[in-house]
Amino acid sequence: MDSVYIETTIVGHIAGRVHPDPLVATRQRVTRDWWRDEARRYEVFISQVVIEECSQGDPSAAAERLEVVKDLDLLEASDDVDELADALISAKAVPASEPRDAFHIAIAAVNGVD
């Protein structure tokens, strides 16, 4: 079975209220359709960072996001993940202002997620 890592934006699109911006609302619809119709075809992973990010903000919205991820497999962070995340930032592949984005990429790559 192929695998996929989902980061917090995906969870927010699944659990969030429909956004008033038509472009964002379309992204939400497409993401929700994928989640409903296709996600079961994959081994879906998250990380502790996703749980931390999902826990932030409005308590009701956070509870909805956490409900989405509660049964997903958790990837473990490691020194290799941290080193790759740092390398992505050093190489300017990910902006230095977005270290969590570098972490999301690194944890999926190091753990061999498709």
Identify the role of each PLM range.
Residues 52, 67-73:
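Short acidic/polar alpha-helix capping motifs at helix-coil junctions
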Residues 50-53, 81-83:
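Short, catalytically relevant binding-site loops at active-site mouths
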Residues 47-49, 77:
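Conserved beta-strand termini and adjacent loop/short-helix elements that scaffold enzyme active sites
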Residues 1-46, 55-66, 90-95:
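Short, well-structured N-terminal submotif of metal-dependent ribonuclease cores
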Residues 71-114:
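Active-site neighborhoods of divalent-metal-dependent phosphate/nucleic-acid chemistry enzymes
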